[in-house]
């Protein structure tokens, strides 16, 4: 593939500008015969998870295709599943630029995007037009100007709109870039949110005559006691899966590197150890009661295997995909 040459050119640009240019091109070919330009053949390695058959265990994490603009082109690269979003009820611009930074030596990224997206109605239109043959996850969040105390209303609004079109729904309560959002991961706030989400799921199942599983995406920056509490809440409320993990606010492994002091969530290789440890702890606590979708620092076959050995049933890539391109998909799926 030409990705090493393309990457060399893109990495000369501001990270967000490089992302915009790449997606402009992918948007032009998505859903057209020109998808052959990015298509690659990967073996089928079916995994049954959350009651769904995934054609292979490797997915694209949320955050790359926030509005579902390029689902078909990304799908042509061989992902078993794609998670679009995070999407909010209303369009919002996100945080001020610059808000995305490369830590090239570390194979990492720091972002403080802030759920920039064109709103849930726009996403649904894009999803309706797509023809992706894999599983489509839709990641939902709350608007920045919605008070945290009313945050569950945003999740329920998004759930209602995406439910007919989602393979599964991911509930993002762990981004560090929306003020107060991570407080929804704990105690009564978490129980209140999960109860409302489960009740909504039951109502939507009755209305649409189909069951769409719900997974909750958690942060890596929790103590073991906090993780145990989260796991207990997920099981008690019959949530279908957990996505571990989101980005970290920690900087231990990137001290002294360019951009390490930027505010935001760190992803990529520096997150691999911590996210894998969270998965291991969750797996020990959950004892198979619900599946784990593992992400955070997967940039090689070995990193992918480490996640699965720790207890993940499915895995997702984001930063590794940016640093290594579509070839990483084939390398992982072929030998996982």
From Swiss-Prot:
UniProt remark on cofactor binding: Binds 1 FMN per subunit.
PROSITE patterns, per the entry: DHODEHASE_1, DHODEHASE_2
Gene Ontology BP term (one): 'de novo' UMP biosynthetic process
One GO MF term: dihydroorotate dehydrogenase (quinone) activity
Enzyme class (EC, first level): oxidoreductase
Cofactor: FMN
Quaternary state and interactors: Monomer.
Annotated function: Catalyzes the conversion of dihydroorotate to orotate with quinone as electron acceptor.
Name of this protein: Dihydroorotate dehydrogenase (quinone)
Gene name as annotated: pyrD
């Amino acid at each position: 593939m030409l990705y090493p040459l393309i990457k060399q050119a893109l990495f000369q640009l501001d990270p967000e500008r490089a992302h915009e240019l790449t997606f402009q091109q992918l948007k032009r070919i998505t859903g057209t015969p020109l998808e052959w330009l990015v298509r690659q053949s990967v073996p089928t390695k079916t995994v049954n998870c959350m009651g769904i058959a995934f054609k292979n265990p490797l997915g694209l994490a949320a955050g790359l295709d926030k509005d579902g603009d390029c689902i078909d082109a990304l799908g042509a690269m061989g992902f078993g599943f794609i998670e679009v979003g995070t999407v909010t009820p209303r369009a919002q611009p996100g945080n001020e630029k610059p808000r995305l930074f490369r830590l090239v030596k570390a194979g990492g990224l720091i972002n403080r995007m802030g759920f920039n997206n064109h709103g849930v109605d726009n996403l649904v239109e894009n999803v309706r037009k797509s023809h992706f043959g894999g599983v489509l996850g839709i990641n939902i969040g709350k608007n920045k100007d919605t008070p945290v105390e009313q945050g569950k209303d945003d999740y329920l609004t998004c759930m209602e709109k995406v439910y007919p079109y989602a393979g599964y729904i991911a509930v993002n309560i762990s981004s560090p870039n929306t003020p107060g959002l991570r407080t929804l991961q704990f105690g009564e706030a978490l129980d209140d949110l999960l109860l409302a989400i489960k009740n909504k799921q039951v109502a939507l199942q009755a209305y649409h005559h189909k069951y769409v599983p719900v997974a909750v995406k958690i942060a890596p920056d929790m103590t073991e006691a906090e993780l145990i509490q989260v796991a207990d809440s997920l099981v008690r409320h019959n949530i279908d899966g957990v996505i571990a993990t989101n980005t970290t606010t920690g900087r231990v492994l990137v001290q002294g590197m360019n951009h390490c002091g930027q505010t935001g969530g760190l992803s990529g290789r520096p997150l691999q150890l911590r996210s894998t440890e969270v998965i291991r702890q969750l797996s020990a606590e959950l004892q198979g009661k619900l599946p784990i979708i593992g992400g955070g620092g997967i940039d090689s076959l070995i990193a992918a295997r480490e996640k699965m050995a720790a207890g993940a049933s499915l895995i997702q890539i984001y930063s590794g995909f940016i640093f290594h391109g579509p070839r990483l998909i084939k390398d992982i799926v072929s030998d996982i």
